[in-house]
């Protein structure tokens, strides 16, 4: 099974500048899929996960458009050929006047 990870700009330094990283291997859950990504792009792990092995609060992970926070967290199911988007939260700016 091949999975496609869509990497945000902030993580591309760990993916050799690639916006998409395709990984092969068996993954039935989000946690297993992320383990495959860490094998390919090990430096990205500390940016996405905290010291307790949880997804950082400012990071959202979507599997085929579904946020894993609402679908089982790291136990969320991953289908064959899934697209997994790692998306840091965006905040700041100024309210319109």
What role is predicted for each listed range?
Residues 1-97:
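Ubiquitin-like/PB1-type beta-grasp interaction modules and other compact soluble beta-rich domains
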């Amino acid at each position: 099974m091949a999975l496609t990870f869509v990497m945000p700009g902030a993580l591309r330094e760990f993916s050799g500048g690639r916006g998409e990283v395709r990984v092969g291997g068996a993954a039935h859950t989000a946690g297993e899929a992320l383990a495959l990504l860490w094998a390919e792009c090990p430096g990205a792990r500390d940016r996405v996960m905290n010291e307790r092995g949880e997804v950082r609060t400012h990071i959202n992970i979507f599997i085929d458009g579904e946020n894993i926070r609402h679908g089982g967290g790291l136990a969320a199911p991953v289908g064959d050929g899934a697209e997994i988007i790692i998306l840091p939260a965006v905040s700041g700016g100024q309210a319109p006047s």
